[in-house]
Amino acid sequence: MFEVTTIDAHVAGGAVRLVTAGLPQLTASSLEERQQLLSERAGPVLAALAREPRGHSGVVVVVLTEGDTPDADAGMLLFRSSGAAAACGHAIIGATGLAITRGVLTPRRHGTVRYDTLAGRLTATSIVLAGSGPVPVRYTGPAATVLQPNMPVNIGRRALRTDVVWSGTELVAIVDAEAAGVPLVSSRALELQRAGADVIRHLDESIRLTHPDTGAHLSVALAVFIGPAPESGMDIRSGTVRADGTVEHTPSAEATAAIAAVLSAMGLMPIGRRLVHQGLLGTTLFATILAMGDAEGRPTVDVEIGGEAWPTGDHVFRFEEADPLLSRD
């Protein structure tokens, strides 16, 4: 038997699990190599932390390592139930809030953590307040840009339009929920899942998009259905479907950045304006455009995403070598 300890939090309802002990030590020269080694040596354990009975499809497991660059405070590796991930906004917010308040890491600059991730540099800022409760965190990452506006897409017999956006970390397709006939309520998640799968499949089969910086081929990671938020003080409500079929009932951070990029491209979101984005649970994240730029003639925006890390528990997970769930694919 062996044990793995974690600290858990949720961010707008998205579960984040920060590993604090129990995984093998990693000696490798790059973040990519550390991820590969960790997957090889502890892949079943990481999968077990993110899957039932210890987890669920929405859990993101965070492992902090050394960074690749001299000014990084830490490297960040992420694992979902479907496997390794390059970046996740909920994980950045949750892990930062937990790591700073619990002393897991001590950043060089008070309240600011610079992460090296497989998606690039992400910088998070947290103001730790006295007492218990949520920890507010904001972060910025690589610039977002609209790659293909107003792309045709089919959902069943409906001919729709979608904006395909590079959020800075993932490829996102944004669709009007009313036009798609998809209600933005948790009780209709199955319909949302089916529509999202149609959007992702159609786009991946019909167009080829590349990373704006590296030129690498990109597949659609998220289908985001948007509509007006029913409550005052909210700007947009959404339901998000991941390529692995997971329905995110929270306001996805990557979707938030992508929506901000689209609104900016339409002239509806100037620098400094705050966007309040509501998910199916009614919880929120916010986005603020800090700067605008240009990449090969395409407008880009630097987006700050903010939310709150709510600590939910400290855990000691026990693993028996004979547990059949440790060996499943």
Residue ranges of model-derived segments:
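Catalytic core of DAGKc-family lipid kinases
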Residues: 147, 160-162
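Internal alpha/beta core interface subdomains
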Residues: 163, 167-182
